[in-house]
Each structure stands twice: as C-alpha cells, then as structure tokens.
Amino acid sequence: HAYHLQQAVERSEARAAVVVLSSNFVQRGEPALQDKWSRAETALRCGADLVLELPVPFSCHNAGVFAKGAVGILASTGVVTHLSFGMEGEIPEMDAILDILLHEPLPFKEKLKSVLALGMSYVEARANAIDALLQGVKDALSTPNNNLALAYLLEVRKRRAPLEITPVIR
C-alpha cells in the first residue's frame, strides 16, 4: 500500500493524500488483521495526510457497496480531486464495460440470468455476460483488484462525481 500511495500522489501531483480505510471489519465480516487505529497510523507514516474510515456496513459488503461508500465519502469532502485504486492491468474495453453495466441492455440481462441459473456467483456470472457482448474480457474481470476497480468506476459514473481517475497497475 505504501507503493500505491506514493504512485497515486506522484501521478496526480496531489498536494495532500486522503485515504479511506476499512473499519475493524473487512469483506465478508472478517476482522481486520490490525485494528483501524494501527492501520490509520501506518497510512499516515506512509504519507497520507488524512485517513477516513469506511463504515462497517460498506467495508463488510461486496465490491459495489464498498465502492459506493468510499466514493461517497471522498466526493462529499469537496476537496478530493482524484481517485486512485489498484488494477491488475489495463482494460482497453473499460468504457464499453461501464456502458453495459450502466444501461444493462437486454442481451446482457438475458445472459446474466441464464448463467446465474447455472449456479455461478454474481461476479462470475456478470463477467460471463459482459464477455458474451465484448469477447475476451472475462479474464480481466475475474481478478479481485479489477472487480473493485470496475466498482469504483461505475460508482463515479453513477454519481457523476468530479473525480479524476488515477489507477495504479500492480
């Protein structure tokens, strides 16, 4: 995370870095390895200027809800101009993917419904449904970092949040 913070500040030319961290509980309701105070202190030592807590109802949920909370917090400050997150690699089709998820065309809905009926997880089924429309993107949508990146981008678009996107490739 220190590398990510350094890269985000460098790429955005930010004068200050605001970090949103999960509470004491993380995805699936599991306790964090370190308490929120220790993690906030570490973030400050690594260069963050302000650390804000992502409340438990967001931090324990899926990527979409997690992103909704984080983007909401950052956008509501009125001072944050950039959003940085990690990705596993560039996804050239990202705008087309976001358009599909925002507008949910009928072929997407039908494919999603059919693959969910096979017992796939929602994330896997969504990747398959998008891949049916934009062949070759399923693998890129199957990694946790890219899934969260997609959730952040989708939330920024839904809110029309004035945040410039600064991804860091891991």
Which residues make up each language-model segment?
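Acidic, Ser/Thr-rich peripheral helices and adjacent loops at domain boundaries
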Residues: S38-E41, L106-P107
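Non-catalytic positions within long, well-ordered alpha-helices that form the structural scaffold/packing
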Residues: V9-E10, L44, V71, A75-S76
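A glycine-rich helix N-cap at a beta->alpha junction
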Residues: E41-P55
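Active-site cores that bind ATP or allylic diphosphates and position pyrophosphate for catalysis
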Residues: E53-R170
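Trp/Phe/Arg-rich N-terminal binding region typifying the photolyase-homology
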Residues: S22, W37, R45, C60-H61, ...
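N-terminal catalytic cores of NTP/NDP-binding nucleotidyl/phosphoryl-transfer enzymes
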Residues: H1-R39
